[in-house]
Amino acid sequence: MKLPFIFLITLLIFVSSCTSILINESSDEERTYSFSPTTSPFDPRSLNQELKIGRIGYCFDCARACMRRGKYIRTCSFERKLCRCSISGIK
């Protein structure tokens, strides 16, 4: 009974010490990130296009939600994530 218990405790100590060594080594590394506009894959035009698509998609979903309620769309603000429908219904 004592032998499996001692083996288990020894194994846990070994695993925990290896884990702490690996964590310390990975946190001690210095990570430097450089930004060079000439080599960067970042394209502001594509980001702008994605934002336009997101805005159109959000307002489209807003309009669909208002129409499901039988109302007109009153306000759609992508930046504030605001979607308001009109008070009066569709005639």
Curated annotation (Swiss-Prot):
Disulfide bonds: C59-C76, C62-C83, C66-C85
InterPro entries (UniProt xref): DEFL_AtLURE1-like
Main location: secreted
GO biological process: pollen tube guidance
Tissues where the protein occurs: Expressed in the pistil. Detected exclusively in the synergid cells.
Keyword Disulfide bond found: yes
GO CC aspect terms: extracellular region
Keywords: Disulfide bond, Glycoprotein, Secreted, Signal
CDD domains found in the cross-reference section: DEFL_AtLURE1-like
Location in the cell: Secreted
Location of the region described as PRK6 binding in the Swiss-Prot/TrEMBL record: 68-88
Annotated signal sequence range: 1-20
Glycan attachment sites: N24
Similarity comment text for this entry: Belongs to the DEFL family.
Subunit description: Binds to PRK6 LRRs.
Role according to the record: Pollen tube attractants guiding pollen tubes to the ovular micropyle. Attracts pollen tubes from both A.thaliana and A.lyrata.
Protein's UniProt name: Protein LURE 1.3
